[in-house]
Curated annotation (Swiss-Prot):
<dbReference type="Pfam" id="PF00009">
    <property type="entry name" value="GTP_EFTU"/>
</dbReference>
<feature type="region of interest" description="Disordered">
    <location>
        <begin position="198"/>
        <end position="219"/>
    </location>
</feature>
<dbReference type="GO" id="GO:0003743">
    <property type="term" value="F:translation initiation factor activity"/>
</dbReference>
<dbReference type="InterPro" id="IPR009000">
    <property type="entry name" value="Transl_B-barrel_sf"/>
</dbReference>
<dbReference type="InterPro" id="IPR036925">
    <property type="entry name" value="TIF_IF2_dom3_sf"/>
</dbReference>
<dbReference type="Pfam" id="PF22042">
    <property type="entry name" value="EF-G_D2"/>
</dbReference>
<dbReference type="GO" id="GO:0003924">
    <property type="term" value="F:GTPase activity"/>
</dbReference>
<feature type="region of interest" description="G5">
    <location>
        <begin position="490"/>
        <end position="492"/>
    </location>
</feature>
<keyword id="KW-0396">Initiation factor</keyword>
<dbReference type="InterPro" id="IPR009061">
    <property type="entry name" value="DNA-bd_dom_put_sf"/>
</dbReference>
<dbReference type="InterPro" id="IPR044145">
    <property type="entry name" value="IF2_II"/>
</dbReference>
<feature type="region of interest" description="G2">
    <location>
        <begin position="379"/>
        <end position="383"/>
    </location>
</feature>
<keyword id="KW-0648">Protein biosynthesis</keyword>
<feature type="binding site">
    <location>
        <begin position="354"/>
        <end position="361"/>
    </location>
    <ligand>
        <name>GTP</name>
    </ligand>
</feature>
<dbReference type="InterPro" id="IPR000178">
    <property type="entry name" value="TF_IF2_bacterial-like"/>
</dbReference>
<dbReference type="InterPro" id="IPR005225">
    <property type="entry name" value="Small_GTP-bd"/>
</dbReference>
<comment type="similarity">
    <text>Belongs to the TRAFAC class translation factor GTPase superfamily. Classic translation factor GTPase family. IF-2 subfamily.</text>
</comment>
Amino acid sequence: MAEITVGQLAQQTNKEVDALLKQLKSFGIEKSSEKDTLTPAEMKTLLEKINSAKNTATRKKVTSVKLDGKHKINVSVKRKRRVAKKVEQQESTTLEQPQELETMVQEVSQQVDIVKGQDNIEQIVENKEAVKVQEQRQAEIAKPVIKDSGFKITAMPEIKIEEIVTEDDEGLSASDKQAKKKAAKKVFSEAVNTNTKYKREEEEKKSKAKKAGGKGFKKANPRQLSQLAGDLESFDEFGAKKGKLKAPKVKKQEFTKPVENTVRTVEIHEGITVSELAQKMAVKGAEIVKVLFNMGVMATINQSLDQDTAILIVEEMGHKYTLHNENALEEAVTTVDRSSYKKISRAPVVTIMGHVDHGKTSLLDYIRQTRVVAGEAGGITQHIGAYSVKTDKGSITFLDTPGHEAFTSMRARGAKSTDIVILVVAADDGVMPQTEEAIQHAKAARVPIVVAVNKIDKPEADPDKVISELAQRNVIPESWGGDVMFVNVSAKTGEGVADLLEAVLLQSEVLELEAFAEGLAEGVVIESRLEKGRGPVATVLVQNGNLKQGDNILCGTEYGRVRAMHNDLGKKIKAAGPATPVEILGLSGVPAAGDEMVVIENEKKAKELAAQRSQKQKEAKIAQEQSLKLSNMFNNMGKEGEQQVLKIILKGDVQGSVEAIRESLLKLSTDEVKVDIIASGIGAITSSDVTLAVASTAVVIGFNVRADSAAKKLAETDGVEFRYYNIIYDLIDDVKKAMSGLLSPEMKEQIIGIAEVREVYRSSKFGSIAGCMVIEGVVKRTNPIRVLRNNVVIYEGTLESLKRFKDDASEVKKGLECGIGVKNYNDVREGDQIEVFEVIEVAKEL
């Protein structure tokens, strides 16, 4: 045998060079590269190692054979025992296979050497004949083994047809290689088919059919071939049945009805929908809707429910419930650990309250030594002002709230954010409605009150009257044995102002006001607005911690980073401690007044929490709008077409003013006409507001704001009128007038004249004619009349004739005689009165 290189051997055996080198090394043949040659002795050693490895049967061998080019047969062979090398030939012809394989490998190797050395075409023909010989041997090997009565299975060694066919591929063309592969597979396929139980059963069936005189089997169609392939897969290579084929079972979904009712524990979160609740209780959504209907609530399966309603439904249907804590994220983010910080004393936050024009802002103006009132429209405070005042005895933070009725919510918000309330009462006016309301807010917030009796410089001032009126409302002065300090002041002359500040500081010492000056800041939004060029601006009162420029803050549903801070004097500052009012810029939107302000370290968490709060508000609003009760629905039946609607688009300068105006206008609604504020916001009137007004036929109202140029042009084109106001009373009065114009006028009767019957005449043309004297007003021919007898109406109709002597008259005045003929009525008697009236339209007023 000629020498061969490692690379040539790897090419002939279709192996990687590295893998072949590792295999040679495992057999004890050390080769380092593909150019190294293999001696005949090394080749012999290699063959011996391969044969010894082949003597041990593998655990499992799976081969695949294609049938008719479309179907495929997988043949699986399992061996459990070691094949003996020397077994008698008559026991099994297959035991000679290892020696024949060795001879075949040697012959193929010789053929490879010959093909390498010669390019003769005749040699290629001899190679083909050698392949035919190998195919014949393979066919003999694949013949079925003769079985005895015990059906003894002999082990068949592994047959590698691919190795036999492909070892001399270098000398053959591509078509010859393909032909060799097809021939080998065909031989093996026939061998397997003749050795299967299926083949034997087919032959038995054919023989029985011939004996019975049948025509035999028809040619199998593709469906039968597919079935044949499936049958063959159930047999192994030796005809042994692997297992009984069973038709695939169709999975049938079944439901066993429970004998007893299952009590489930339902987790309820805020805003759960009807469909979600039904799914958690394993019932249909229609069942939940039915329960809601019985409770007097109309709902759909997609409607959100509040937790209280969901709890009632769960209990009604016999289940248990647990409440889901949706504030876990908020508690984790907003909770600040201040255990390592110390508290320090802080300045008191004082809110000035009182009735309109009682001098609240004037008093604060004197304290600050500035002219704030001059800047207020009409001298009326329109929104909360936060100011910090330094005195000789310490600093005081003042919150100035509006006093008129519209700003109830703003006064309530001021009371919640304050430590002390200064109740300003005019000495010449006494206790007024907003004074009582301020007392209620202060008591509800449990805030101590210091009463400032203002305008004592006026001659008509009566402080004792104020004290007695407040005492009737349970505000008892210290001089009467109570706990409320009364101070007489004059915002005009400054009398008593120092005593008032001293009383406030004394009250703050009693309260022992403290706060944390370190750590993340907390506070409350006093006011917010949208400014051109600056964006959302919020006035914030810091209550704890230290607010610094650059902090990430969360205010209600808005978040952002503090880009700039200004104090009450308009100066830029970098940090603000407790009880300090500041103006901040950098929020994503305009927060609502009264929202809590917290500093959050992670901006991503702040954004996530703001989105969660916004979603909750939307869901709550939708749930409130959609929850119609049967009683309201029945009450509103028949009123839909009667009620007039005044649609308004409201824009204001600050959030608090817009909120107050909105509440005041909504209170004006009656059964006949209602106010519908379809949109409200802060900032200038824009073109989008005009477009909305045109689409909804609404009135655009601006409070301390104006329309931009684009909105003005669009308004001129579409015929939209803007109404501007800077005093809230004027706005409310004009809206009242507009609502009155929408009301249908009332019809009222007005008596214009009375005639007394003195004598009755008979006329062939008109019947009874009453000779009358006009004793009051004017009797007109065209007006309706009533006939009164003993001051009781006995007839109502019209006049047929009115004459003065013999002439027809259109009217007869007081003190003159006339003849009156009543149409379709002849029972006129002496002493009766004929009352003449007219119907006039009177405009309704709210």
